[in-house]
Amino acid sequence: MRLEELKRLQNPLEQVNDGKYSFENHQLAMDAENNIEKYPLNLQPLESKVKIIQRAWREYLQRQEPLGKRSPSPPSVSSEKLSSSVSMNTFSDSSTPFARAPVGKIHPYISWRLQSPGDKLPGGRKVILLYLDQLARPTGFIHTLKEPQIERLGFLTLQ
């Protein structure tokens, strides 16, 4: 390779015929590509995120079962200190949202305080009941969803 050709290939300004703006656009495009490669975006559909969270929750429940069998105590007074985020429950069967057995397994406080459709949690908190094929409790992202998105996923929101 000749020295002139090597310099031309190393300096992208000489390759751009349209002047400064074309080079800047090219540089911005290259920066964007490099950032995407360095920081891959997680663009999974919401349904697959729910499945990942379901799987993690099932594994957590399996680890907690031996602990629950050792100390079958009723919910304590400190369980009233729920976070201000949305509380959620799901059922593994096709039972009604207020079937007490599955809810009690997931969150004793909910089954203790929420006995019928008219009941509310302290502070007017919402409860989202999820109808999914497996016992699960998604947390961390549901509270960021808007009501239409939640309904699209088949979640029931109680006021």
UniProtKB/Swiss-Prot annotation:
Low complexity: compositionally biased ranges: 76-87
Domain IQ residue range list: 47-67
Region spans: Disordered: 63-88
Pfam families (alphabetical): IQCJ-SCHIP1
Coiled coil region boundaries: none
Domain of life of the source: Eukaryota
InterPro entries recorded: IQ_domain_protein (IPR053113), IQCJ-SCHIP1_N (IPR029362)
Protein name per Swiss-Prot or TrEMBL: IQ domain-containing protein J
